[in-house]
C-alpha cells in the first residue's frame, strides 16, 4: 500500500501539494514513483516560469516510461529542487521529502478546493488497484 500523508492535497494525476501560506510545494506521490520504477531523469521549469493547473510542467523518466508532470495549481515557480535534477533517485527514495520538485507562488487559491483530500486520494488508489 502506498504512503498517503494526511497534511497534503492530491491530484488525480498523482501529484501532491503542501501549502504553506501562498507557497505550494509540489511533487509526485509514492504511488506514482512506485508505478514508474527507477527514475533516471527529471525535467522541470525554471524559476519565474508560470504554470497553470492541469497543464504539464515537466517530465519524469524512468527505466520503464516517461510521464508528464501536471500542475495541481496555477502560479509562478519560485524555487526548483536542483537536487532531484542531479539525483533523480531521490524521488524514489523520499517522494514527500527530499524528492519534492518545485515551489510555486499560488495565484488562485480556489484551485486547492478542486484537489483531493488524503481520504479521497486513497479511494482513487483503491479504484486503480492499489
UniProtKB/Swiss-Prot annotation:
All residue ranges annotated as the Lipoyl-binding domain in the record: 23-105
GO biological process, one term: glycine decarboxylation via glycine cleavage system
Source organism superkingdom: Bacteria
One Pfam family named in its UniProt record: GCV_H
Cellular component terms per the entry's GO annotation: cytosol; glycine cleavage complex
Cofactor(s) named in the record: (R)-lipoate
Signal peptide range: none
Record's keyword terms, sorted: Lipoyl
HAMAP family, per the entry: GcvH
Family according to the record: Belongs to the GcvH family.
Reported function: The glycine cleavage system catalyzes the degradation of glycine. The H protein shuttles the methylamine group of glycine from the P protein to the T protein.
Protein name, per record: Glycine cleavage system H protein
Amino acid at each position: 500500500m502506498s504512503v498517503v500523508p494526511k497534511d497534503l492535497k492530491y491530484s488525480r494525476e498523482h501529484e501532491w501539494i503542501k501549502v504553506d501560506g501562498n507557497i505550494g510545494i509540489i511533487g509526485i506521490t509514492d504511488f506514482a514513483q512506485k508505478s514508474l520504477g527507477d527514475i533516471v531523469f527529471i525535467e522541470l521549469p525554471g524559476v519565474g516560469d508560470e504554470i497553470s493547473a492541469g497543464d504539464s510542467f515537466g517530465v519524469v523518466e524512468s527505466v520503464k516510461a516517461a510521464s508528464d508532470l501536471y500542475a495541481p495549481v496555477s502560479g509562478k515557480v519560485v524555487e526548483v529542487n536542483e537536487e532531484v535534477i542531479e539525483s533523480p533517485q531521490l524521488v524514489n527514495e523520499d517522494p514527500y521529502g527530499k524528492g519534492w520538485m518545485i515551489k510555486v507562488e499560488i495565484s488562485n487559491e480556489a484551485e486547492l478546493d478542486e484537489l483531493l483530500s488524503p481520504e479521497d486520494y486513497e479511494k482513487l488508489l483503491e479504484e486503480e488497484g492499489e
